[in-house]
Design a protein with these regions (language model features):
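Hydrophobic, glycine- and aromatic-enriched re-entrant/interface helices and adjoining loop segments
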Residues: 102-108, 194-281, 299-307
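Alpha-helical transmembrane segments of multi-pass membrane proteins, especially transporters
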Residues: 37, 146, 150, 175, ...
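Hydrophobic alpha-helical transmembrane segments
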Residues: 44-48, 122, 272-289
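Hydrophobic alpha-helical segments of polytopic membrane proteins
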Residues: 76, 81-82, 148-209
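Alpha-helical transmembrane segments of multi-pass membrane proteins
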Residues: 12, 84-91, 130-131, 158, ...
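Membrane-helix boundary/helix-loop-helix interface segments in multi-pass membrane proteins
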Residues: 1-7, 18-21, 26-166, 323-338, ...
């Protein structure tokens, strides 16, 4: 198992817990809730995320699980994909039981805790796209209609259900980017990339002009003209300076910065830890992404490689959109920062996907060890043979 990836995950989870300990009570009191609401909730989310990561890490570990998966993989993935699509459609209808709507958007289910099915759709899209690429590569139909039709149908469903019905542009972009990067790495031609890019642009404009698009247009307008949210995010970075104001001294968390514990946690880290703290965090993400892509390069099986690349794209998209939105480089999308932000659904699902990468790194490192051992054996045998010839 890649120890560096494990250490980075532990560090990020610990930093997120520390930040929640520092600002959670202030945010809770500002909202009229008990001061330990968010800290206790985040501890519970981390516990569930660790379990999810362990499940992902041992998913294919046992021989019986591997054989069952190989035999029924296609049926399981298709059922999971279409079942998750149906669940997200259900979530989009406000009149149905358990559906939870906030600020005019129906994205959550109230099942004793708030759960966001679009996060589960990321896992479904990850497995579905990896299977589609691997299956079509094996059959020699990759890049043909047998590949493009189901892929574009899947992408269209994501745009309509998550982007239009649930009004969640952030998760829509993450899923489409993930599916696109997996297809690109698998061997898309430049012509196919151009066509796919054109379709994405057309779809984005259509999404902005479909139905109740006011809040999406406002996000784009605020990007060029400034906004309360964006301005206060920059103020948070300025307040932190080079070394930060320290734990417990955040001003932005007292109500000046919206969604301080989730969608705006990077400016809070910049305020508490300063420029150096924020840069250390970004360096940590760069190392994590590098180790993930290094794992993907060692995978011989196309489907396994696509799974790892998909997780790479998932984390990369979240980091770019969260950080880029907070520093004013791109429009805000309301996305979390992986392993740090408050949010049980997001944390659990990305932890499960990360666990899959850890599991795949076990096999690649085991293969590397076997290769090194056999190589040393061959070299030792050569030296011994030479010595015997000389004697």
């Amino acid at each position: 198992m890649d120890v560096v990836l494990v250490i980075l995950a532990v560090i990020f989870l610990a930093v997120g817990l520390l930040v929640m300990y520092a600002i959670g009570p202030r945010v809770a009191l500002a909202e009229g809730k008990p001061e330990n609401t968010y800290f206790v909730g985040h501890v519970r989310s981390i516990a569930m995320a660790v379990i999810a990561m362990l499940v992902g890490a041992i998913f294919f570990w046992r021989d019986k699980v591997q054989s069952f998966w190989k035999e029924h993989k296609t049926q399981i993935i298709k059922i999971f994909w279409w079942g998750t699509i149906a669940l997200n459609i259900y979530t989009s209808i406000s009149a149905l039981p358990l559906t939870q709507c906030e600020l005019g958007a129906c994205r959550w289910l109230n099942v004793g805790m708030s759960f966001q099915p679009s996060e589960l759709l990321k896992i479904a899209a990850l497995f579905y796209t990896a299977w589609l690429v691997g299956d079509r590569k094996e059959k020699g139909t990759y890049g043909k209609a047998e590949f493009w039709v189901p892929l574009l149908v899947a992408a269209a469903l994501v745009v309509v259900i998550v982007g239009f019905l649930q009004k969640d542009l952030g998760n829509t972009v993450v899923i489409i980017f993930m599916m696109g990067l997996m297809s690109f790495v698998a061997g898309m031609t430049w012509a196919q990339i151009a066509i796919a890019g054109l379709l994405v642009i057309v779809g984005a404009f259509a999404l902005l002009n479909m139905g109740d698009s006011e809040h999406r247009a406002d996000r784009l307008a605020s990007f060029s003209s400034g906004s309360y949210h964006g301005d206060n995010a920059l103020v948070s970075f300025g307040t932190g300076g080079l070394t930060g104001v320290g734990i417990g001294n955040s001003i932005s968390a007292t109500g000046y910065l919206p969604e301080a514990i989730s969608d705006s946690i990077f400016p809070i880290i910049g305020e508490i830890g300063g420029f150096f703290g924020a840069m250390l965090l970004l360096i940590g993400y760069l190392i994590m992404l590098y180790r993930i892509q290094a794992t993907s390069h060692r995978m011989e099986n196309m489907e396994d490689q696509m799974l790892v690349i998909g997780v790479f794209a998932w984390i990369l998209a979240h980091v770019i959109m969260h950080v880029g939105g907070m520093v004013g480089m791109i429009p805000m999308k309301g996305t979390t920062l992986p392993f740090l932000s408050y949010g049980g659904s997001s944390l659990m699902c990305v932890a499960f996907a990360y666990g899959i990468v850890l599991q795949k790194s076990c096999w690649t490192q085991r293969e590397d060890i076997n290769e090194d051992t056999s190589s040393r054996g061959r070299q030792r045998g050569t030296r011994d043979a030479g010595y015997r010839r000389r004697s």
